[in-house]
Amino acid sequence: MEMRGKITKINENGLGVLGNILVPFAYPGDEVEVTETRERFGKIIARDFKLMTPSPLRIPGKCSHFGKCGGCLWQGLRYREQLKLKEEIFKRITGIEAEIKGSPRIWYFRNISNFIITVNGIGFKEFGMPKTVVNIRECPIFSERTPKYLKALKDFLRESNLKPWNWREGDVHYLQVREGKFTGEVMVNIIAHVPLNYREALMEAFNFADSIYWSLKADKKDDPRGFPTLVLGNEVIREKVEGITYLIHPSVFFQTNSYALPLLLKSVEKFCEGSKVLDLYSGIGTLSLYLAKRGFEVTGVEVNGTSVEMAKRSAEINSINATFIQGKAEDAELEGYETLIVDPPRKGLKEFSRRIVKKGPNTLIYVSCNPLRFILDYRNYLSEAYKVDDALLIDMFPHTPHIEAVIKLVRR
């Protein structure tokens, strides 16, 4: 299918809209000529297009891989326009007007990156093409040291003669790198399908890292997950945000933008009522530790045992008094608190919302990177007992359409 015209708007997934065609890397005001399309999930997506007349909102991309790599749909859009679009998209999805706070840094802000290692290249997947890899040289949203990390990986692969992933089999699958943006510490984690037999080569290639892990992957799923074993260095790396040192292990989640994290922490604190706070899906205690340091009496509940261990150890080294319990958030005792914080996985709360409706406190703070899931939880369950009192958006993900929302709900 071919079509020429002007992009009229951006859809909820960050794609330009041209009639019934969705155009990646295109922005309102762009005049484009779509020359090739494909169908995916019932949608017609532009596979190739020519930019005939650029929108005044457009700027040159900083990255040489922009336009192919699927990581940064909006890198060619002025940052203030990105923020405006995120407010508009959030309102379109939820019906809620909310102010957005921009990230203090919009380049080299990510503290984690997962480089897929394949026979076709090492890097990130092409937009909409899950088996096509962009062989990258740089990544301006992750780290200025990306070329150094990739060179070390290639040196190791050459010395070890290990085979890259070919979508069915292979020895090594991912290189995961984490950086402490405020500590300078680096963790390297190789996700592989074979045990480590080239320890010396690995240590030599990544001799700059503070922590080196080898994670054995038991399945063939295309994700950067395995069972980590420490090869050399420290068990954890540290990140320091708002005066709190957080301990980070390869098996845990940490917010990906260390520079914007203070905005998220302060937004949650602003919405808290009373002194007794229950933090569900608390992870390594990112919110709990900050709130406890600010004087709240906080209990965090998290199912991941390693995350709970990191939270407890972080509390100890920071001399912070907070309680952390390992268990399912859905089984937590909800009574006796004045504020409940939920930061669920992307699938949302679903049926657990019914218990919150019955037994939750007067104030509920819903932290979400998935506005659609939030509004489904709200309309289907939470609205029975709660109403939206306030909301703030934090741009944790510049150059992408992703939105982090903090929504305050109060009992009707």
From Swiss-Prot:
Active site as annotated: C369 (nucleophile)
Gene3D superfamilies, A to Z: 2.40.50.1070, Nucleic acid-binding proteins (2.40.50.140), Vaccinia Virus protein VP39 (3.40.50.150)
SUPFAM superfamilies for this protein: S-adenosyl-L-methionine-dependent methyltransferases (SSF53335)
Entry EC no(s): 2.1.1.189
Binding, [4Fe-4S] cluster: C63, C69, C72, C139
Residues at which S-adenosyl-L-methionine binds: Q255, Y281, E302, D343
UniProt enzyme class: transferase
Annotated catalysed reactions: uridine(747) in 23S rRNA + S-adenosyl-L-methionine = 5-methyluridine(747) in 23S rRNA + S-adenosyl-L-homocysteine + H(+)
Annotated GO MF terms: 4 iron, 4 sulfur cluster binding; metal ion binding; rRNA (uridine-C5-)-methyltransferase activity
Pfam family, one: tRNA_U5-meth_tr
Keywords from the UniProt entry: 4Fe-4S, Iron, Iron-sulfur, Metal-binding, Methyltransferase, rRNA processing, S-adenosyl-L-methionine, Transferase
Annotated TM spans: none
Gene Ontology biological process terms, A to Z: rRNA methylation
NCBIfam families assigned: rumA
Function: Catalyzes the formation of 5-methyl-uridine at position equivalent to 747 (m5U747) in 23S rRNA.
Family membership noted in the UniProt record: Belongs to the class I-like SAM-binding methyltransferase superfamily. RNA M5U methyltransferase family.
Protein name: 23S rRNA (uracil(747)-C(5))-methyltransferase
